[in-house]
């Protein structure tokens, strides 16, 4: 179904969704296909969808209104919710167990970041004080909640959020993802709402993996280490970057969308294995007893040592000074002990035990874990050494067979998981609606 009309420069076509399927076109501005939008207008050399037309109209209307009626205040742009540090901390406490120092640091940093954005909208030209952006570096072992902290912050502030693995990034021209891919993912997360994307949060995981491989200059390029750090500098600090909406290398012919990164908050996280030894060596120069006691430890992390991390330590680890300087807020996370893992299982709003309980409730069954079962889950997770991630792995391995059988079992009102079930040495206890034991058929 097409409808043609004459224009001054030639023919345009209005391509309505639901045509005969013989023509596949994409918006030259946002990259959406004709099937994803209500209408697509085709010009001699380009296409534009109805959503981009509306966005363009809104922009032009505001600009014309400002010129013709300067006394009229323009419509307020999208601004994230400005939440106080205490409110941010209270929200984080509902989902993240422990890590009080890191949560406080994040709460203040995020509050100041979005307060800075808010002040920019009403800043006078004669105001000489310009508040710089403060991106965040989270340092802590695997499974301590770095990603969860960033995700929870984005949900609280109602801003777009995306996660990227730093190990997939390489310099432009090499196999892997360009750094612009980071912004493309945020653009998708915002449903191509540019104004929202420019105030979103990006979490870059495994940032320690792009540390320089060696302190010595090599004749071969370090395309996934220092090269990526150099490529990330401009988007971390704030620049207008041309972003390919479908990804950079598979569709080189596509139109670029310009994103200004000056108000995007970047949170980088990494385990930084071995960093504690670098810190201990530095400290031991002035306090031999303290330093030697740390380096004698066989376990990787000492939380007390990590609290003393400095930018110089990160430089020695392999991050370049320019990159470190663009992540001024440093916060460390502690390894999770047995008490913390036990709390993670049952206390947060989205605790694993509560999630499984909800799934069983949908089948009309009450789920219960005995205290001994929970202790056994924690013990196995500690043995695996991957923090909170191990909890889900242990439970999923145990629960999958139970959840496979349960929907076809009749008359079950309650399912009790014991320590023997966790160790795969016994069956769950099934009770009927009256509380009587029920054997599995």
Curated annotation (Swiss-Prot):
Q: Write the record's keywords in alphabetical order, separated by commas.
A: ATP-binding, Chaperone, Metal-binding, Nucleotide-binding, Zinc
Q: Which residues form the ClpX-type ZB domain?
A: 15-68
An individual GO BP term: cell division
Any GO molecular function: ATP binding
List ligand-binding residues for Zn(2+): 27, 30, 49, 52
Sites where the protein binds ATP: 141-148
Identify one Gene Ontology CC term for this UniProt entry: HslUV protease complex
Q: What is the top-level taxon of the source organism?
A: Bacteria
Keyword Zinc in the entry? The reply is yes
Q: Which HAMAP family match?
A: ClpX (MF_00175)
Main function: ATP-dependent specificity component of the Clp protease. It directs the protease to specific substrates. Can perform chaperone functions in the absence of ClpP.
What family is this? Belongs to the ClpX chaperone family.
Assembly notes: Component of the ClpX-ClpP complex. Forms a hexameric ring that, in the presence of ATP, binds to fourteen ClpP subunits assembled into a disk-like structure with a central cavity, resembling the structure of eukaryotic proteasomes.
State the protein's name. Answer: ATP-dependent Clp protease ATP-binding subunit ClpX
**Species of origin:** Chlorobium luteolum (strain DSM 273 / BCRC 81028 / 2530)
């Amino acid at each position: 179904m097409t409808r043609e009309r004459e224009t001054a420069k030639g023919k345009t076509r209005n391509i309505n969704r639901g045509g005969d399927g013989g023509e596949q076109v994409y918006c030259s501005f946002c990259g959406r296909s004709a099937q994803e939008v209500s209408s697509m207008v085709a010009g001699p050399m380009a296409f534009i969808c109805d959503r981009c037309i509306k966005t363009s109209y809104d922009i032009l209307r505001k600009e014309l209104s400002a010129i013709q009626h300067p006394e009229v205040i323009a419509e307020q742009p999208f601004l994230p919710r400005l939440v106080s540090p205490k409110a941010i901390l209270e929200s984080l406490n509902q989902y993240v167990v422990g890590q009080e120092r890191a949560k406080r640091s994040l709460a203040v940093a995020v509050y100041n970041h979005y307060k800075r954005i808010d002040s920019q909208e009403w800043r006078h030209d004669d105001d000489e004080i310009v508040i710089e952006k403060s991106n965040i570096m989270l340092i802590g072992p695997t499974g301590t909640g770095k990603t969860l902290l960033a995700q929870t912050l984005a949900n609280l502030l109602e801003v777009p959020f995306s996660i990227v693995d730093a190990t997939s990034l390489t310099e432009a021209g090499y196999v892997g993802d360009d750094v612009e891919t980071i912004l493309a993912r945020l653009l998708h997360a915002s449903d191509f709402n540019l104004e929202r994307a420019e105030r979103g949060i990006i979490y870059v995981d495994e940032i320690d993996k792009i540390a320089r491989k060696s302190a010595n200059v090599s004749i071969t390029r370090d395309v996934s280490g220092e090269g990526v750090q150099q490529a990330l500098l401009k988007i971390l600090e704030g620049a207008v970057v041309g972003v390919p909406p479908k990804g950079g290398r598979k569709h080189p012919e596509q139109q670029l969308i310009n994103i200004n990164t000056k108000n995007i908050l970047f949170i980088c996280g990494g385990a930084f294995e071995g960093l504690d030894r670098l810190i201990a060596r530095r400290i031991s120069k002035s306090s031999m007893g303290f330093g030697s006691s740390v380096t004698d430890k066989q376990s990787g992390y000492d939380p007390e040592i990590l609290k003393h991390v400095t930018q110089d330590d990160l430089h020695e680890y392999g991050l370049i000074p320019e990159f470190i300087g663009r992540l001024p807020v440093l916060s460390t996370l502690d390894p999770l002990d047995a008490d913390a893992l036990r709390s993670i299982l049952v206390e947060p709003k989205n605790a694993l035990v509560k999630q499984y309980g909800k799934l069983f409730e949908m089948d009309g069954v009450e789920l219960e874990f005995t205290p001994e079962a929970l202790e056994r889950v924690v013990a196995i997770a500690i043995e695996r050494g991957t923090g909170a991630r191990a909890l889900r792995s242990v439970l999923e391995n145990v629960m999958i067979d139970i959840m496979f059988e349960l929907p076809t079992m009749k008359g079950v009102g309650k399912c009790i998981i014991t320590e023997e079930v966790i160790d795969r040495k016994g069956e769950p206890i099934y009770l009927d609606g009256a509380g009587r034991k029920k054997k599995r058929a």
